[in-house]
Amino acid sequence: MSTAKPSDPANPTPAKLILTVIDGMKPTMVQRAMSSGDAPALKAIADRGQYVPGCAAAFPSVTPVCAATIATGVLQDVHEIPSMNWYSRAEQRYVEYGSSFSASRRFGLNRQLVDTIFNMNATHLSPDVPTVFETLDDTEQVRTAGTTYLIYRGRHEHEISRDFALTRAASQLFKRSALGPRELFYADIFASRKTSCWSRMGLPGMRDQHAGCVGSYLVENDLFDFMLLSLPDNDAHSHKNGPHAQIQSIAAADAELWRVMEAGGGTDAFLDEHAMIVMADHSHSSIERRIDLTGAFADWRVLPPSGAGARHAELALCPAQRSAMIYLLLEARESALTSVVERARAIEGVDLVMWWDAERVRIGGERGELSFAPGDEVADARGRRWSVDGELDTLLAHVEDGVLHCDNYPDGLTRVWAAMNCPTSGDVLLSAEPAYEFPDWGNRAHVRGGSHGSLHRVDSLGALLFCGVPAPPQRTDGNWSIADVAPMIIEHFGAA
Protein backbone atom coordinates (compact mmCIF):
# COMPACT_ATOMS: atom_id res chain seq x y z
CA MET A 1 0.00 0.00 0.00
CA SER A 2 1.06 3.62 -0.55
CA THR A 3 3.02 5.39 2.14
CA ALA A 4 2.03 8.82 0.80
CA LYS A 5 0.66 11.20 3.40
CA PRO A 6 -2.96 10.24 4.07
CA SER A 7 -5.85 12.44 2.96
CA ASP A 8 -6.90 13.02 6.56
CA PRO A 9 -8.79 16.25 7.37
CA ALA A 10 -6.83 16.35 10.63
CA ASN A 11 -3.57 16.40 8.67
CA PRO A 12 -2.76 20.03 7.80
CA THR A 13 -0.46 19.01 4.96
CA PRO A 14 -2.05 16.35 2.76
CA ALA A 15 0.13 14.80 0.09
CA LYS A 16 0.43 16.54 -3.22
CA LEU A 17 -1.95 14.97 -5.71
CA ILE A 18 -1.64 14.50 -9.48
CA LEU A 19 -4.69 13.63 -11.56
CA THR A 20 -3.48 12.17 -14.86
CA VAL A 21 -6.01 11.77 -17.68
CA ILE A 22 -4.91 9.41 -20.47
CA ASP A 23 -7.48 10.07 -23.16
CA GLY A 24 -9.39 6.99 -24.33
CA MET A 25 -7.35 4.46 -22.32
CA LYS A 26 -8.98 1.06 -22.84
CA PRO A 27 -8.85 -1.26 -19.79
CA THR A 28 -7.78 -4.39 -21.70
CA MET A 29 -4.95 -2.45 -23.33
CA VAL A 30 -3.62 -0.90 -20.13
CA GLN A 31 -3.69 -4.33 -18.49
CA ARG A 32 -1.64 -5.76 -21.35
CA ALA A 33 0.77 -2.81 -21.23
CA MET A 34 1.32 -3.30 -17.50
CA SER A 35 1.74 -7.07 -17.87
CA SER A 36 4.25 -6.73 -20.71
CA GLY A 37 6.38 -4.17 -18.90
CA ASP A 38 5.41 -1.35 -21.28
CA ALA A 39 3.74 0.71 -18.55
CA PRO A 40 5.98 0.58 -15.45
CA ALA A 41 4.69 3.85 -13.99
CA LEU A 42 1.07 2.72 -14.19
CA LYS A 43 1.99 -0.66 -12.73
CA ALA A 44 3.75 1.00 -9.80
CA ILE A 45 0.61 3.00 -9.05
CA ALA A 46 -1.63 -0.07 -9.36
CA ASP A 47 0.70 -2.13 -7.15
CA ARG A 48 0.55 0.48 -4.39
CA GLY A 49 -3.14 1.20 -4.68
CA GLN A 50 -6.16 0.08 -6.67
CA TYR A 51 -6.90 -0.70 -10.31
CA VAL A 52 -10.48 -0.32 -11.54
CA PRO A 53 -11.09 -1.97 -14.94
CA GLY A 54 -14.42 -0.29 -15.58
CA CYS A 55 -15.15 3.38 -14.82
CA ALA A 56 -18.24 4.65 -16.66
CA ALA A 57 -17.98 7.72 -18.87
CA ALA A 58 -20.69 10.29 -19.44
CA PHE A 59 -22.99 9.92 -22.45
CA PRO A 60 -22.24 10.96 -25.14
CA SER A 61 -18.88 9.42 -24.29
CA VAL A 62 -16.91 12.14 -26.09
CA THR A 63 -14.06 14.17 -24.64
CA PRO A 64 -15.71 17.58 -24.03
CA VAL A 65 -18.58 16.06 -22.05
CA CYS A 66 -16.32 13.70 -20.12
CA ALA A 67 -13.66 16.36 -19.47
CA ALA A 68 -16.30 18.62 -17.94
CA THR A 69 -17.57 15.76 -15.76
CA ILE A 70 -14.06 14.87 -14.58
CA ALA A 71 -13.32 18.51 -13.75
CA THR A 72 -16.60 19.19 -11.94
CA GLY A 73 -17.79 15.85 -10.57
CA VAL A 74 -21.23 16.24 -12.17
CA LEU A 75 -22.88 15.17 -15.42
CA GLN A 76 -24.08 17.52 -18.14
CA ASP A 77 -27.53 18.12 -16.70
CA VAL A 78 -25.52 20.32 -14.32
CA HIS A 79 -22.34 21.31 -16.20
CA GLU A 80 -24.15 21.90 -19.56
CA ILE A 81 -21.46 20.78 -22.03
CA PRO A 82 -23.58 18.47 -24.22
CA SER A 83 -21.32 17.04 -26.93
CA MET A 84 -18.44 17.55 -29.35
CA ASN A 85 -20.75 19.29 -31.81
CA TRP A 86 -24.01 20.92 -30.75
CA TYR A 87 -26.51 23.62 -31.65
CA SER A 88 -26.81 26.74 -29.52
CA ARG A 89 -30.47 27.67 -29.32
CA ALA A 90 -29.50 30.97 -27.67
CA GLU A 91 -27.15 32.00 -30.51
CA GLN A 92 -28.91 30.01 -33.26
CA ARG A 93 -25.67 28.48 -34.51
CA TYR A 94 -23.60 25.31 -34.30
CA VAL A 95 -20.81 24.95 -31.75
CA GLU A 96 -17.91 22.76 -32.90
CA TYR A 97 -15.04 21.75 -30.59
CA GLY A 98 -12.75 20.21 -33.21
CA SER A 99 -14.17 16.88 -34.40
CA SER A 100 -11.65 17.04 -37.25
CA PHE A 101 -9.74 19.70 -39.16
CA SER A 102 -12.14 19.36 -42.09
CA ALA A 103 -15.15 19.83 -39.80
CA SER A 104 -13.52 22.86 -38.17
CA ARG A 105 -12.92 24.41 -41.58
CA ARG A 106 -16.60 24.10 -42.46
CA PHE A 107 -17.63 25.89 -39.28
CA GLY A 108 -14.78 28.40 -39.49
CA LEU A 109 -11.40 27.82 -37.89
CA ASN A 110 -11.42 31.04 -35.90
CA ARG A 111 -14.88 30.34 -34.50
CA GLN A 112 -13.93 26.75 -33.62
CA LEU A 113 -10.76 27.86 -31.82
CA VAL A 114 -12.58 30.56 -29.86
CA ASP A 115 -15.33 28.12 -28.86
CA THR A 116 -12.85 25.43 -27.80
CA ILE A 117 -10.16 27.49 -26.08
CA PHE A 118 -12.25 30.28 -24.56
CA ASN A 119 -16.03 29.89 -24.76
CA MET A 120 -16.13 26.30 -23.53
CA ASN A 121 -14.80 27.45 -20.15
CA ALA A 122 -16.01 31.05 -20.02
CA THR A 123 -19.61 30.70 -21.24
CA HIS A 124 -20.58 27.13 -22.24
CA LEU A 125 -19.57 25.46 -18.96
CA SER A 126 -22.22 26.43 -16.42
CA PRO A 127 -21.05 29.29 -14.17
CA ASP A 128 -23.04 27.71 -11.35
CA VAL A 129 -20.87 24.59 -11.04
CA PRO A 130 -17.30 24.97 -9.74
CA THR A 131 -14.44 23.08 -11.29
CA VAL A 132 -11.97 21.26 -9.08
CA PHE A 133 -9.53 24.10 -9.81
CA GLU A 134 -12.01 26.73 -8.62
CA THR A 135 -12.88 24.80 -5.47
CA LEU A 136 -9.23 24.34 -4.52
CA ASP A 137 -8.29 27.90 -5.53
CA ASP A 138 -11.01 29.17 -3.19
CA THR A 139 -9.22 27.61 -0.22
CA GLU A 140 -6.25 29.95 -0.91
CA GLN A 141 -4.08 27.15 0.49
CA VAL A 142 -3.85 24.68 -2.41
CA ARG A 143 -1.56 25.57 -5.30
CA THR A 144 -3.25 24.39 -8.50
CA ALA A 145 -1.68 23.58 -11.86
CA GLY A 146 -2.78 22.13 -15.18
CA THR A 147 -1.44 21.12 -18.58
CA THR A 148 -3.44 21.23 -21.82
CA TYR A 149 -6.95 20.06 -20.88
CA LEU A 150 -10.26 21.18 -22.33
CA ILE A 151 -11.66 22.26 -18.95
CA TYR A 152 -9.21 24.47 -17.09
CA ARG A 153 -11.37 27.15 -15.43
CA GLY A 154 -9.92 28.44 -12.17
CA ARG A 155 -9.60 31.70 -10.27
CA HIS A 156 -6.29 32.99 -11.68
CA GLU A 157 -6.15 35.26 -14.73
CA HIS A 158 -3.77 34.36 -17.56
CA GLU A 159 -2.77 36.36 -20.62
CA ILE A 160 -1.88 34.66 -23.90
CA SER A 161 1.80 33.82 -24.04
CA ARG A 162 4.04 35.81 -26.37
CA ASP A 163 6.98 33.38 -26.26
CA PHE A 164 6.54 32.09 -29.83
CA ALA A 165 5.64 33.71 -33.14
CA LEU A 166 2.39 31.72 -33.33
CA THR A 167 1.32 32.69 -29.82
CA ARG A 168 2.15 36.33 -30.51
CA ALA A 169 -0.13 36.09 -33.53
CA ALA A 170 -2.78 34.38 -31.38
CA SER A 171 -2.62 37.20 -28.84
CA GLN A 172 -3.43 39.68 -31.61
CA LEU A 173 -6.18 37.45 -33.03
CA PHE A 174 -7.99 36.57 -29.80
CA LYS A 175 -7.19 39.61 -27.62
CA ARG A 176 -8.52 38.05 -24.45
CA SER A 177 -7.36 36.47 -21.21
CA ALA A 178 -8.64 33.37 -19.43
CA LEU A 179 -9.23 32.23 -15.87
CA GLY A 180 -7.42 29.03 -14.94
CA PRO A 181 -5.43 27.30 -12.20
CA ARG A 182 -2.51 29.12 -10.61
CA GLU A 183 -0.09 27.47 -13.06
CA LEU A 184 -1.61 27.04 -16.52
CA PHE A 185 0.16 25.57 -19.55
CA TYR A 186 -2.24 25.15 -22.48
CA ALA A 187 -0.78 24.25 -25.89
CA ASP A 188 1.76 27.12 -25.77
CA ILE A 189 -1.17 29.57 -25.82
CA PHE A 190 -1.06 29.99 -22.05
CA ALA A 191 2.17 29.50 -20.11
CA SER A 192 2.40 30.78 -16.56
CA ARG A 193 6.18 30.67 -16.65
CA LYS A 194 8.93 30.48 -19.22
CA THR A 195 10.16 26.92 -19.64
CA SER A 196 11.93 24.94 -22.36
CA CYS A 197 8.66 23.09 -23.08
CA TRP A 198 6.98 23.41 -26.49
CA SER A 199 3.96 21.61 -27.93
CA ARG A 200 3.91 23.08 -31.45
CA MET A 201 0.58 24.66 -30.53
CA GLY A 202 -0.85 21.38 -29.25
CA LEU A 203 -0.29 19.21 -32.31
CA PRO A 204 -1.26 15.52 -31.85
CA GLY A 205 1.86 13.52 -31.11
CA MET A 206 3.46 16.48 -29.33
CA ARG A 207 1.01 16.98 -26.50
CA ASP A 208 2.14 14.16 -24.20
CA GLN A 209 5.79 15.19 -24.33
CA HIS A 210 4.75 18.80 -23.61
CA ALA A 211 2.76 17.64 -20.58
CA GLY A 212 5.69 15.52 -19.38
CA CYS A 213 8.07 18.46 -19.79
CA VAL A 214 5.77 20.86 -17.94
CA GLY A 215 4.95 18.30 -15.24
CA SER A 216 8.63 17.64 -14.60
CA TYR A 217 9.31 21.37 -14.37
CA LEU A 218 6.48 21.85 -11.86
CA VAL A 219 7.75 18.94 -9.74
CA GLU A 220 11.38 20.07 -9.81
CA ASN A 221 10.44 23.61 -8.79
CA ASP A 222 7.78 22.68 -6.21
CA LEU A 223 5.05 24.73 -7.87
CA PHE A 224 1.87 22.78 -7.12
CA ASP A 225 -0.15 20.89 -4.56
CA PHE A 226 -2.71 19.66 -7.11
CA MET A 227 -1.88 19.15 -10.78
CA LEU A 228 -4.04 17.91 -13.64
CA LEU A 229 -1.63 16.21 -16.04
CA SER A 230 -3.33 15.64 -19.39
CA LEU A 231 -1.89 12.97 -21.74
CA PRO A 232 -4.20 13.07 -24.79
CA ASP A 233 -2.13 11.49 -27.57
CA ASN A 234 -3.44 7.97 -26.91
CA ASP A 235 -6.82 9.09 -28.26
CA ALA A 236 -5.46 10.28 -31.62
CA HIS A 237 -3.32 7.13 -31.96
CA SER A 238 -6.33 4.92 -31.26
CA HIS A 239 -8.57 6.85 -33.67
CA LYS A 240 -6.04 6.28 -36.44
CA ASN A 241 -4.79 2.76 -35.70
CA GLY A 242 -7.62 1.21 -33.71
CA PRO A 243 -7.98 0.48 -30.00
CA HIS A 244 -5.90 -2.69 -30.15
CA ALA A 245 -2.88 -0.58 -31.12
CA GLN A 246 -3.05 1.30 -27.84
CA ILE A 247 -0.16 -0.50 -26.15
CA GLN A 248 2.26 1.71 -28.07
CA SER A 249 0.48 4.96 -27.18
CA ILE A 250 -0.12 3.91 -23.57
CA ALA A 251 3.60 3.15 -23.31
CA ALA A 252 4.35 6.65 -24.64
CA ALA A 253 2.01 8.20 -22.07
CA ASP A 254 3.54 6.05 -19.34
CA ALA A 255 7.01 7.30 -20.33
CA GLU A 256 5.91 10.89 -19.67
CA LEU A 257 4.41 9.90 -16.34
CA TRP A 258 7.67 8.12 -15.50
CA ARG A 259 9.52 11.31 -16.48
CA VAL A 260 7.46 13.28 -13.96
CA MET A 261 8.18 10.70 -11.26
CA GLU A 262 11.91 10.79 -12.02
CA ALA A 263 11.84 14.55 -11.52
CA GLY A 264 10.65 13.83 -7.99
CA GLY A 265 13.42 11.38 -7.10
CA GLY A 266 12.25 8.19 -8.82
CA THR A 267 9.16 6.04 -8.54
CA ASP A 268 9.37 4.97 -4.91
CA ALA A 269 10.40 8.35 -3.52
CA PHE A 270 7.81 10.10 -5.66
CA LEU A 271 4.93 7.83 -4.65
CA ASP A 272 5.94 8.14 -1.01
CA GLU A 273 5.20 11.86 -1.27
CA HIS A 274 2.42 12.07 -3.87
CA ALA A 275 -1.10 10.73 -4.18
CA MET A 276 -1.89 9.66 -7.75
CA ILE A 277 -5.06 9.20 -9.77
CA VAL A 278 -4.74 8.02 -13.38
CA MET A 279 -7.87 7.62 -15.46
CA ALA A 280 -9.42 7.45 -18.89
CA ASP A 281 -12.21 9.83 -19.83
CA HIS A 282 -13.82 7.11 -21.98
CA SER A 283 -12.75 4.00 -23.88
CA HIS A 284 -12.45 3.16 -27.60
CA SER A 285 -13.98 0.58 -29.93
CA SER A 286 -13.20 -0.58 -33.46
CA ILE A 287 -14.98 1.07 -36.41
CA GLU A 288 -15.99 -0.77 -39.57
CA ARG A 289 -18.90 1.17 -41.08
CA ARG A 290 -20.30 4.69 -41.44
CA ILE A 291 -23.83 5.82 -40.55
CA ASP A 292 -25.55 8.00 -43.16
CA LEU A 293 -27.23 10.52 -40.86
CA THR A 294 -27.48 13.39 -43.34
CA GLY A 295 -28.77 11.08 -46.06
CA ALA A 296 -31.52 9.84 -43.77
CA PHE A 297 -32.82 13.40 -43.42
CA ALA A 298 -32.11 14.53 -46.99
CA ASP A 299 -35.76 15.52 -47.50
CA TRP A 300 -35.70 17.83 -44.47
CA ARG A 301 -34.29 21.36 -44.44
CA VAL A 302 -31.13 20.78 -42.38
CA LEU A 303 -29.14 23.75 -41.11
CA PRO A 304 -25.70 23.70 -42.79
CA PRO A 305 -22.46 24.54 -40.94
CA SER A 306 -22.43 27.99 -42.56
CA GLY A 307 -25.78 28.82 -40.98
CA ALA A 308 -27.21 29.79 -44.38
CA GLY A 309 -31.00 29.65 -44.50
CA ALA A 310 -31.29 29.44 -40.73
CA ARG A 311 -34.77 31.02 -40.68
CA HIS A 312 -36.16 28.21 -42.80
CA ALA A 313 -34.21 25.26 -41.35
CA GLU A 314 -36.20 22.44 -39.83
CA LEU A 315 -33.40 20.45 -38.16
CA ALA A 316 -29.88 20.86 -36.83
CA LEU A 317 -27.88 17.62 -37.04
CA CYS A 318 -24.98 17.20 -34.63
CA PRO A 319 -22.87 14.06 -35.21
CA ALA A 320 -20.25 13.29 -32.57
CA GLN A 321 -18.38 10.11 -33.47
CA ARG A 322 -20.56 7.23 -32.17
CA SER A 323 -23.34 9.50 -30.96
CA ALA A 324 -25.48 12.18 -32.53
CA MET A 325 -28.07 14.77 -31.53
CA ILE A 326 -30.98 16.17 -33.53
CA TYR A 327 -32.47 19.58 -32.71
CA LEU A 328 -35.99 20.43 -33.88
CA LEU A 329 -36.06 24.00 -35.17
CA LEU A 330 -39.75 24.00 -36.07
CA GLU A 331 -42.56 25.61 -34.10
CA ALA A 332 -44.66 22.46 -34.58
CA ARG A 333 -42.18 20.44 -32.55
CA GLU A 334 -44.53 17.75 -31.28
CA SER A 335 -45.67 16.58 -34.70
CA ALA A 336 -42.12 16.77 -36.04
CA LEU A 337 -40.75 14.78 -33.10
CA THR A 338 -42.71 11.65 -34.01
CA SER A 339 -41.48 11.76 -37.60
CA VAL A 340 -37.85 12.39 -36.60
CA VAL A 341 -37.85 9.55 -34.08
CA GLU A 342 -39.34 7.11 -36.60
CA ARG A 343 -36.79 8.13 -39.22
CA ALA A 344 -33.88 7.87 -36.76
CA ARG A 345 -34.90 4.40 -35.59
CA ALA A 346 -34.83 3.17 -39.19
CA ILE A 347 -31.23 4.27 -39.88
CA GLU A 348 -28.78 1.41 -40.34
CA GLY A 349 -26.23 1.38 -37.53
CA VAL A 350 -28.33 3.27 -34.99
CA ASP A 351 -28.64 1.20 -31.83
CA LEU A 352 -30.73 3.41 -29.54
CA VAL A 353 -32.87 6.53 -29.98
CA MET A 354 -33.78 8.71 -26.98
CA TRP A 355 -36.46 11.41 -26.70
CA TRP A 356 -38.85 13.04 -24.24
CA ASP A 357 -42.38 11.69 -23.73
CA ALA A 358 -44.10 14.12 -21.34
CA GLU A 359 -42.06 13.95 -18.10
CA ARG A 360 -40.36 10.67 -18.96
CA VAL A 361 -37.47 9.76 -21.23
CA ARG A 362 -38.20 7.12 -23.85
CA ILE A 363 -35.54 4.85 -25.36
CA GLY A 364 -36.23 2.82 -28.48
CA GLY A 365 -34.27 0.30 -30.50
CA GLU A 366 -34.55 -2.98 -32.36
CA ARG A 367 -35.04 -4.92 -29.10
CA GLY A 368 -37.99 -2.84 -27.95
CA GLU A 369 -38.86 0.36 -26.15
CA LEU A 370 -38.95 1.57 -22.55
CA SER A 371 -39.60 4.80 -20.68
CA PHE A 372 -38.19 5.90 -17.35
CA ALA A 373 -37.95 8.71 -14.83
CA PRO A 374 -36.71 9.06 -11.25
CA GLY A 375 -39.01 7.07 -8.99
CA ASP A 376 -39.08 4.40 -6.31
CA GLU A 377 -39.75 1.17 -8.19
CA VAL A 378 -36.24 -0.16 -8.72
CA ALA A 379 -32.66 0.78 -7.80
CA ASP A 380 -29.74 0.74 -10.21
CA ALA A 381 -26.27 -0.56 -9.37
CA ARG A 382 -25.18 2.85 -8.02
CA GLY A 383 -28.21 3.13 -5.74
CA ARG A 384 -30.33 5.60 -7.68
CA ARG A 385 -34.01 4.74 -7.85
CA TRP A 386 -36.19 4.79 -10.95
CA SER A 387 -39.63 4.20 -12.37
CA VAL A 388 -39.24 2.03 -15.48
CA ASP A 389 -41.96 0.92 -17.91
CA GLY A 390 -41.62 -1.18 -21.04
CA GLU A 391 -39.17 -3.76 -22.28
CA LEU A 392 -35.97 -4.04 -20.25
CA ASP A 393 -34.40 -5.90 -23.16
CA THR A 394 -34.16 -2.52 -24.91
CA LEU A 395 -31.03 -2.01 -22.77
CA LEU A 396 -30.31 -5.74 -22.35
CA ALA A 397 -31.16 -5.14 -18.69
CA HIS A 398 -32.65 -7.35 -15.99
CA VAL A 399 -33.81 -6.97 -12.40
CA GLU A 400 -32.34 -9.17 -9.69
CA ASP A 401 -33.14 -8.77 -5.98
CA GLY A 402 -34.71 -5.39 -6.66
CA VAL A 403 -31.65 -4.04 -8.48
CA LEU A 404 -31.64 -3.13 -12.17
CA HIS A 405 -28.52 -4.50 -13.86
CA CYS A 406 -27.55 -2.89 -17.17
CA ASP A 407 -24.11 -4.32 -17.89
CA ASN A 408 -24.06 -3.60 -21.63
CA TYR A 409 -24.99 0.05 -21.05
CA PRO A 410 -23.25 0.81 -17.73
CA ASP A 411 -25.03 3.33 -15.51
CA GLY A 412 -27.31 3.69 -18.50
CA LEU A 413 -30.37 5.33 -16.97
CA THR A 414 -28.40 7.99 -15.10
CA ARG A 415 -26.27 8.83 -18.13
CA VAL A 416 -29.25 9.09 -20.49
CA TRP A 417 -31.26 11.09 -17.96
CA ALA A 418 -28.39 13.57 -17.56
CA ALA A 419 -27.98 13.89 -21.33
CA MET A 420 -31.68 14.46 -21.93
CA ASN A 421 -31.94 16.96 -19.06
CA CYS A 422 -28.98 19.00 -20.26
CA PRO A 423 -30.49 22.34 -21.39
CA THR A 424 -28.14 22.50 -24.39
CA SER A 425 -28.73 18.93 -25.61
CA GLY A 426 -30.71 18.04 -28.70
CA ASP A 427 -34.34 16.94 -28.74
CA VAL A 428 -33.45 13.46 -30.00
CA LEU A 429 -30.25 11.60 -29.08
CA LEU A 430 -28.75 8.67 -30.98
CA SER A 431 -26.29 5.98 -29.92
CA ALA A 432 -24.57 3.84 -32.54
CA GLU A 433 -24.30 0.07 -32.69
CA PRO A 434 -20.83 -1.37 -32.06
CA ALA A 435 -18.56 -0.94 -35.12
CA TYR A 436 -20.59 1.99 -36.54
CA GLU A 437 -19.77 5.72 -36.50
CA PHE A 438 -21.47 8.95 -37.58
CA PRO A 439 -19.16 10.95 -39.93
CA ASP A 440 -18.64 14.51 -38.74
CA TRP A 441 -19.58 17.62 -40.73
CA GLY A 442 -16.25 17.36 -42.54
CA ASN A 443 -17.25 13.82 -43.65
CA ARG A 444 -14.50 12.36 -41.46
CA ALA A 445 -14.96 8.95 -39.85
CA HIS A 446 -12.52 6.44 -38.38
CA VAL A 447 -13.25 3.32 -40.44
CA ARG A 448 -10.55 0.70 -39.76
CA GLY A 449 -9.55 2.77 -36.74
CA GLY A 450 -11.18 3.43 -33.39
CA SER A 451 -13.80 5.75 -31.96
CA HIS A 452 -16.18 6.32 -29.04
CA GLY A 453 -19.27 8.28 -28.08
CA SER A 454 -22.02 5.70 -27.61
CA LEU A 455 -23.86 4.49 -24.53
CA HIS A 456 -22.53 0.96 -25.07
CA ARG A 457 -19.90 -0.50 -22.73
CA VAL A 458 -17.32 -0.79 -25.53
CA ASP A 459 -16.97 3.01 -25.52
CA SER A 460 -18.03 3.75 -21.99
CA LEU A 461 -15.81 1.78 -19.60
CA GLY A 462 -12.35 3.27 -19.18
CA ALA A 463 -9.53 2.39 -16.81
CA LEU A 464 -8.91 4.00 -13.40
CA LEU A 465 -5.88 3.59 -11.11
CA PHE A 466 -5.07 5.39 -7.87
CA CYS A 467 -2.86 5.28 -4.81
CA GLY A 468 -2.34 7.50 -1.77
CA VAL A 469 -6.00 8.52 -1.72
CA PRO A 470 -8.87 6.33 -0.49
CA ALA A 471 -11.83 5.19 -2.54
CA PRO A 472 -15.16 6.75 -1.54
CA PRO A 473 -17.00 4.42 0.86
CA GLN A 474 -19.91 4.01 -1.56
CA ARG A 475 -17.57 2.73 -4.27
CA THR A 476 -16.11 -0.20 -2.37
CA ASP A 477 -18.48 -2.44 -4.37
CA GLY A 478 -17.36 -1.03 -7.72
CA ASN A 479 -19.74 0.63 -10.19
CA TRP A 480 -17.45 3.61 -10.67
CA SER A 481 -18.22 6.74 -12.67
CA ILE A 482 -15.83 9.42 -13.88
CA ALA A 483 -17.98 11.78 -11.76
CA ASP A 484 -16.52 10.13 -8.63
CA VAL A 485 -13.02 11.53 -9.12
CA ALA A 486 -13.43 15.27 -8.45
CA PRO A 487 -15.04 14.61 -5.04
CA MET A 488 -12.09 12.33 -4.15
CA ILE A 489 -9.69 15.19 -4.90
CA ILE A 490 -11.70 17.79 -3.00
CA GLU A 491 -12.01 15.46 0.01
CA HIS A 492 -8.27 14.76 -0.09
CA PHE A 493 -7.55 18.46 0.42
CA GLY A 494 -10.33 18.94 2.97
CA ALA A 495 -12.07 21.42 0.68
CA ALA A 496 -15.49 19.76 0.67
Model regions: which residues?
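Secreted, luminal/periplasmic, and some membrane-associated catalytic domains
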Residues: G37, P53, P60-V62, M84-N121, ...
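His/Asp/Glu-rich, glycine-adjacent segments
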Residues: V74-K240, F372-C406, S425, P439, ...
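Active-site-proximal N-terminal segment of extracellular/periplasmic enzymes that hydrolyze or transfer
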Residues: M1-Y51
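Short, structured active-site-proximal loop/turn typified by the sulfatase FGly-forming signature C/S-X-P-X-R
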Residues: Q31-N85, A145
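C-terminal, low-complexity/hydrophilic appendages and adjacent surface loops
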Residues: E391, V399-V403, T424-G426, S431-V469
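Short secondary-structure boundary/capping segments
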Residues: A33-G37, I160-A165, G242-I247, R289-D299, ...
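A long, amphipathic alpha-helix that forms part
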Residues: G205-L229, N234-M276, V416, D484-A486
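Substrate-binding rim/cap in mid-to-C-terminal beta-strand-loop elements of soluble/periplasmic
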Residues: R301-E331, G449-H492
